[in-house]
């Protein structure tokens, strides 16, 4: 194949590596249905979360102090023996997200619903998701 700028592509080879990690009962694509927190500065919060093979991706949108904010994050999802999960950020749009870790309590309420609870800025946050 020849491009307009003169480059020629004879063969394209893609190599994909699987990121190390274990599957979990939480693997899937989830959308936030309910968020409980006592932070009145954060409103209209939405989140989509994908969990799979020991990793997660989150996409968030909200109003913070009246201004629209959008963020994303990717990291490891390590299920511990006590059922809690250690989420460690690898890359994201938040400042200092790489290496940021938090312990999260996950619970499957049925096959299509889960909750997660964690502490952020001294506030407990509980979020309920439905499987997409």
Language-model-detected regions and their locations in the chain:
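Lipid interaction determinants
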Residues: 1-76, 80, 84-132
